[in-house]
Amino acid sequence: MKRNITLTTLALACFMGMAPCKTKAQNTVPSASKDVYDFKSFTDTELLERFAELVEKKRKYPTNEELKTWGIYEELEFVRSHVRKRNIMSRTDRLVSDTHAERDLLMNIPCGSGKTYGGYPSHDFMSDNFSMWNYTNLFGAWNHGLFQAPGSWADAAHKNGTDMLSGMKFFDTTGGRQEGSGNWKNFITTKNTDGTFKYAHALINLLRFLGLDGINYNWEASGYDDENVIKFHQELYKIAQQEKFDNFHIMMYTSNSSLSTWNSEALWGKNGARTTELMLNYSSSDFTHSMGTSVQAAEQALGTSKGLYAGVWIVSMNRSWSRLNADDNARKCGVCLWGEHSESRFWSYNTGGDPNERMSNYQMLLERAFSGGNRNPLTRPSISNSGNDWEWSGTTPPLSKFAGLATWIPERSAIEGKLPFSTYFNLGNGDRYSYKGKKTAGPWYNMANQDIVPTYRWLVVQSETNTVSNAIQPELTNRDAYTGGACLQLNGLSTATSTDIVLYKTSLKGTQGDIYANVAIKSGKDGTNPSNLYLIVRIGNSTWKEYPVGDTTDKNWTEKRIKLDGISATDAIERIGLRVKDCNENYRLLVGKLEINDGVKATPSNIKDLTIQVKEETKTSLSVKASWGIDAQGANGLQGGLVYNDEGNIDHFEILYKNGENGRVSEVARTTQWAAYVGNIQLPKESDEPYIGVRSVSTDLKTYSPVVWTKIDRANQSDLPVAKDNPYGTVELDMVANGAEVAQKIRYITDFKTEGAEQDIIYHAEQPTGGANYVDATDKVIKVKQGQTVTVKFKGYEAKDNVDGSHDDLRYCMGKGWLDLDGDHLFNPADLTADPNHGECLFHLGKVRAGSPEQVQGLVSHSFTVPQNARKGMSRLRIVFSDAWFAGSLVPIGKFNKGFAIDFGVEIVSDNAERPVPADTHDQGEAAEPEGLTTTGITEVAGAASALQVTNEALNFNNVEKAWIFSVDGRLVEYLTSPQSYRTNKLAKGVYLVKMQNKNVIRSQKITVQ
């Protein structure tokens, strides 16, 4: 496999690439920093050293003060998972009966996009929100170093009964690479004076402190079969068993494509002592032929093949899928999908014309991969080793002919126990945050706000039968939301009397009182209209009960409370679904909430130690990172370890916002972590007073803790940057994607001109723009008339090996151009030629995974005709290039991969009738205040904004109670209390990070000492 850059290397490079303040007289604004996360202190060996020191002191876990000294306190809660992993229910009643009941799936792929920072909460709506946990046993987090996988992804996994590995340790000496395991081998085999392994207890304690479930190896080098390495790994399993850490894993991947008696002790175990779990290397990128014999070797060594996976490289899906059921032994072998290092092939291959279309396509691509090409696990295409194409073929979507992983892997559900059950069908992201249908905040991404996923995607049948129905097609969409950023959309395809969508396999019982449901729906139609929707639940093995949801009375979201007569607390609810009666091809309904509850009551633990970090502050906006604790202690909490949410009767947390002490309260985020990021809070007035509040929500879903509020004092307006407001949305280079630095140097447009317009323009660039690799050239305005044909010509910079050291320029990109023709400040993804009434995509150039030298060796020419009814006034032409190997990032808004973007102004003139501005179908108006607010909220005393003035001789602090100075490698250099001034001659030359705390608000600033 290709080299995986280590956390230390990447974090150091990222840190050094930031623009620090040099030690000359200058006022700095720490809160203006755009560097949201700082993981340079999360190196595996350093953390293990820290935890080994605690073991020597007869302790397992660190104090908060120690965490601050280590430099990880502010980021820690973004790495931890406080969601207890749910247990998987029996799979004996699996949908596809000829699958092996215990066969498991390992998704050994990245979480999120980009090394180190991928998957962490952000305001990037267009982000990887993998959701097929209903088939996944174990997730690999391939793009993160050990102990640094995002806790938000672990939360999503744990809710669905999936284990999350903590990240990767990478060794590869194949093909002459020099990435050996010697240093790591020597480190982990270090022993104490009594002969015990120094870091064994430390590693287990560290994982349990983080709430992550194991470690992941790519060990394509020597050393894994070293006697002491074997004993160390076996000792880890022994300690985990003693600690009742029952879902601990060591996932091993080596050059071996088979398990046998000669390597089983190193790669599997011996005499009842497990060494590792194993991903069998692929054979010529395909499944190994040795699945059956490897299963036999595993059973001979440990009596089980659980934890053995046959790997396949999913750069292509045309693989030998038929080998998976070659014989009875092969059928027992788990399956592992691998690919790739910084983002998964599912995400990089997925495309869409705009962010919403790409996100919808992503969920449907996942469904075809897992449930089969028909997106219904009950009716799958036949097994084929070819024709399983990643790309669209005309109007045929990718993987439409694939049999689906459901052919071999049984579905999984972890929804058991006591009511309540609730879902908003959230996927972990949104182009806005909505509360009861109305917008409260902007774009967001947080996998800790992904709801439990449906067990079946999608089990659509004729009512109360196992006969497949094609009358209704469900989909998860981000185009609207009741609360959060997504909802379930039901689309009618044909006429049918009654159709069931079976969503969840469950084993749920009530606690007390009447059982009821809350269901939120939206028809988008004015007036009173029948929803034709029924909630259905199956009691026991066979009895279905249906309950009408009722009519909609307008086009907006409405929430219905439904009494579930005939169900008592002793009845076991085994299936939950929806039924549509009398549907036709015009049927369309959104479902934004499905909750089943009863009279249960539980008091949630209170919030404590709320800390706010201010980021990305401008004159009119700011972002916040919040972290907190709770006043509960579980079994581990008594020793200073991890406390699970359920030990505090907590289902989730709500992040609230108000402008002014008595301002109107809005819910702006939810999470199951003890941390949250809320981006770009708008503060249009200098007098605005932002308050951030956090409260816990009970497991009963109707009881709340008091809100803990913190006022955010603004930095001086004169010192803050002006927000870059782009009415057409931000488009920028993905800085954590591979090759970003190459794009900044040699991927850009040098020449652009128009011909045939009322007013033509000429643009020329002598050098790259760098940074976000976006050029705002809207001061150059093209004037066009309705019905006029215009030609655009442009050329990319041609890089030369002897000049630039590379020719990796725009020839290796694909590009698109869009023109807003209806005045909605959006870019309709449809092609203008194919759809002249709606399309706004003018051209598409380049080839998938191939070079196009003509893009840099001469002017590329494209002509288009402005529609006769184009909306008059000022508009925008946007051109975006993205790497040809990452076609999914070629969209008009968001982050492009290793590419370039430029905007030009356009003025449309003439006297023809103009097309209307498309209606915004979201609910309009101000959102309601959150439920359960009381006057007993707690407002913590705020402190003035910390400030740092840097001179040639000193660091001068203002409004700082505590300060920490860290070196570039994360080492604490100095801890200061109530500092006024600090002499810089105490510091060696170099880059430092200064963290300053006043009350419970933290700001950070980088400095350079020269």
Q: What is each PLM-predicted segment?
A:
Residues 622-646:
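Conserved aromatic anchor
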Residues 718-920:
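A broad "non-catalytic interaction surface" signal
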